[in-house]
From Swiss-Prot:
Keywords: ATP-binding, GTP-binding, Nucleotide-binding. GTP binds at residues 76-79. The keyword Amino-acid biosynthesis does not apply. It comes from Sorangium cellulosum (strain So ce56). Residues 310-353 are annotated as: Disordered. Belongs to the RapZ-like family. ATP binds at residues 27-34. Residues 344-353 have a biased composition (Polar residues). The keyword Isomerase does not apply. This is Nucleotide-binding protein sce5766. GO terms for molecular function: ATP binding; GTP binding. Signal peptide: none annotated. Displays ATPase and GTPase activities.
Length: 353
């Protein structure tokens, strides 16, 4: 049985019994180190950027003492005395650990273009201006990093890679065993246009062309989570056609958004008050797409619990009991969903149109 000192000296085993993994991300400035670190974070790595080489071993040991077995470290020429301490620092953490050095590079032309687009100076540019000074910085950085490049476990040329491509490559090459590739999280939000559109929506669909149950006796105080409202809306051929066509569009788009590295997708479906038509169609589309795409989908009915003209909170009662995915927060008109409306404020004027 090893004591705490042995554990620190020989590293910490992961949940599967494998040695802890430390990925050191380095390379040319502008080659994509930040993107690579973000990809590691998506894989569950604890990442620290711009770490001085003298703190590499203490940082790794501190993480392991807290039970962290996947660690990402970003090191570049902006760190003082980089070359002097890099070799010793990396050697100090190799024992008992799976240490990977990821070196990122790109063509001089590509690096210059990226710095020009971001309007940021190269970290080694100490004087002069324009492309000549920038190129001098790139060439000097290549020279300084030559010895570390020779020690790299993985070398990636990002010249022809977009940020999404680089993220995908890093995940493919460095994903630990038993760790799933991060999947895009999709959220469907039903809402009422009279209260404003969801500010975080990527896609919006307007279903106010359908007949409104608000004007049907016995349906006004119900919501789209109640079966009578659902039956009323879905007996309309236009509603079924909308579901079919929108499902085809989203089943085409969603996997492609996910493959491009998009982490979140918010789809808004709106009617006038957000209590009837949008709720029914949001439920129908999300259920179908969840089965077809296999992507995680959550549902929020933002305005389903707003107060109707009668003063009775719509949807409150037997029809709402246990309704899945219902957000019962009462938001102020024009406010974001994170700003709850006081429960005592039930003033809503005017009926639906």
């Amino acid at each position: 049985m090893s004591n705490g000192g042995d554990q620190q000296q020989h590293g910490l085993l992961g949940p599967d019994g494998a040695p802890g993994r430390v990925v050191v991300v380095t390379g040319l400035s502008g080659a994509g180190k930040s993107t690579a670190l973000h990809a590691l974070e998506d894989l569950g790595f604890f990442c620290v950027d711009n770490l001085p080489t003298s703190l590499v071993q203490p940082a790794v040991e501190a993480c392991e003492s807290g039970g962290i077995t996947r660690i990402g470290l970003g090191i570049d020429v902006r760190v003082g005395s980089f070359l002097a301490g890099a070799t010793a620092a990396l050697d100090s953490i190799r024992t008992g650990r799976d240490v990977v050095i990821l070196f990122l590079d790109a063509s001089d032309e590509t690096l210059l273009r990226r710095f020009s687009e971001t309007r940021r100076p190269h970290p080694l540019t100490t004087g002069g201006s324009g492309a000549i000074a920038m190129l001098d910085g790139v060439l000097l950085e290549r020279e300084r990093l030559a010895s570390l490049r020779a020690r790299a476990t993985i070398e990636l040329d990002t010249t022809r890679l977009s940020t999404h491509d680089l993220r995908r490559v890093v995940i493919e090459r460095l994903r630990p065993a038993r760790v799933e590739v991060p999947r895009m999280s999709t959220r469907f939000v039903s809402f009422g246009y009279k209260y404003g559109i969801p500010l975080d929506a990527d896609l919006l669909f307007d279903v106010r062309f359908l007949d409104n149950p608000y004007f049907v006796h016995g349906l006004r105080e119900l919501t789209g989570n109640d079966e009578p409202v659902r039956e009323y809306i879905l007996k309309n051929p236009d509603a079924l056609e909308f579901i079919c066509r929108t499902e085809q569009l989203l089943s085409f788009c969603m996997p492609r958004y996910a493959s491009e590295g998009k982490s979140y997708l918010t789809v808004g479906i709106g009617c006038t008050g957000g209590r009837h038509r949008s709720v029914v169609l949001t439920n129908a589309l999300s259920d179908s797409l969840r089965r077809k795409t296999g992507l995680p989908i959550t549902v929020v009915h933002r305005d389903v619990a707003r107060v109707s003209t009668s003063g009775v909170p719509s949807g409150v009662g037997e029809g709402m009991a246990g309704a899945p995915g219902v957000d019962l927060r009462l938001a102020q008109p024009g406010a974001t969903p994170s700003e709850p409306r006081p429960a005592s404020d039930t003033s809503v004027t005017g009926g639906e149109r």
